[in-house]
Amino acid sequence: MKKIEIYTTNYCPFCVKAKSLLNKKKIKFYEIDVSNDEALREKMSAMANGARSVPQIFADNILIGDCDKIHKLDNEKKLDKLLGLEQKA
């Protein structure tokens, strides 16, 4: 499975929603709180093509997207593959 990182703040309802989806799918992830750390937010922004909003979700340092994006991908049955969850035949 890929290393999943989610950049969050402690006051973001979309972060809670994104983490809830990952937890529901039993996906292990590393949460990086950028609430009070401008250097971490800048790092996240650089990796997220300039986006400063949270959450931002990455799989093996590759941007997957924000809360809306991961829910859209999940509804389209594409999220598992991007996160490295698909079973090999």
Residue ranges of model-derived segments:
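Local sequence-structure signature of Cys/Sec-based thiol-disulfide redox active-site neighborhoods
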Residues: 1-30
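Non-catalytic interaction surface on structured domains
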Residues: 23-28, 46-47, 71-72, 81
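Structural signal for short hydrophobic segments within the conserved structured cores
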Residues: 30-32, 62
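Thioredoxin-like thiol-disulfide oxidoreductase module
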Residues: 34-52, 82-85
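Structural micro-motif
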Residues: 49-58, 68
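Non-catalytic, surface beta->alpha helical segment in thiol-disulfide oxidoreductase systems
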Residues: 59-86
